[in-house]
Each structure stands twice: as C-alpha cells, then as structure tokens.
Amino acid sequence: GEGVTLNFLISANTDIGTTKQTNQDSLAVKILNTVQGRMVFAVLCDGMGGLANGEIASASLVHAFESWCSQELPKLCKAPLEDNVIRNQWEKIIDEMNQKIKVYGLKQGVRMGTTAVVMLLTDQRYYIMNVGDSRIYELGDQLSQLTTDQTVVGREVALGHITEAEAKVDERRNVLLQCVGASDTVYPEMIFGSPKANTVYILCSDGFRHEISSEEIASDRKSVV
C-alpha cells in the first residue's frame, strides 16, 4: 500500500544531568538513502556500571548497531524488508554484545550493562527493538508509548498489582528485568507497525522522562505545531 511521505526533522541531545560525573547515554541517528527510498535509523543506549564503564557499554552497543546499519542493511534493501529478518539480525547483535560486555565487565571486576532502544523507520513500516527502560514514544494526535518498560514495576503494572501512579514513586522503579551485559540471556521486545503522517517519534532514556512527564511532552508538541 501507499506509505507516508518521509520528510525528516531530526534533533538529538544528551546531558550528564545533575548527579553523575559522566554521561552514560550514547546515541546515533542516521538518514539513509536506500534503493527502497529514504529511511531513518536511530539507536539510544543508557549505560550503567559506574564512571566510564556505563559509557563503554552504551557506546559499544551503539557502535555495533551503526555497523549493522552501514554493512548489513544495504544488503537487506535489495529485497523487501522482512520483520523476522530484522528481528533475527538485531537479536544476534544483542546476544553477541551481551556476552562481550559481560566478559569485559568480569575482566574489570565490575557489573556493567546498557539499555537499548533501536528504530528503523521507512515510509511503509517501523521496526523497533527495546531492552530495559529507555522508551520510544509516538506523538501524533496523542502521545502513546510504543515500548514496554522491562522493569520490576513495569511488570507489576502489567499484572495489575500496582497502578501507574504508584509505579512512579515505587523505589524499585529503576530495577531492570533485562539489561545488555548484565542478563544471562536477553529477551528483547520487538514492535512492528506502520508510521502515521505528521507524527513525531521520540527515543529517550529514563533520565529524560523522570524529569519531564508524558503530559509535558504532549503539551510541548501542541505549542510547536
């Protein structure tokens, strides 16, 4: 079917914040001209492990996905993109990097890891992968969270044990169920869908959304559109 016309306005920003000495967020955003048309590829990782270790974990995973984008994606574009092929290749990257980061951490004597949100956007489809508690939002007529937090409180909310309001103040809200480099096996969440016209996609780490509420994100959109 007909896809949406892709015109891109891209903005990326990262900040150390007020309580850390190092910035453990890493990100990359690329506009791609492929034989199947223009695409956007974005990856954001939020590392943990103290000082430089979290930064190493997040940057190494971003680099692995950048390599996929430059080396593997052009090959895939020779034929129509398939959900399962993207899923398998991304899961392989996560699996390999989970082991590499874990081994590096053991050598350094530290526990380290990183969250990840990855998005490939074409005029027909979006492909999303999520590990941990970074998020991807879709902001059109209303704001919707496309990813599901892989956290203890996220699971409790999903099971109906606590409310969204209770989750925001629960002291376990930063406890991850999944983390690249710290989990024995990582089970990424995969999401596939069709992009809508006049829509903003927001990739953000937990530090951003703990400071800025969903309501503020939505109202900011209304003030600039």
Model-derived regions: residue spans:
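PP2C/PPM-type serine/threonine phosphatase catalytic domain
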Residues: 1-225
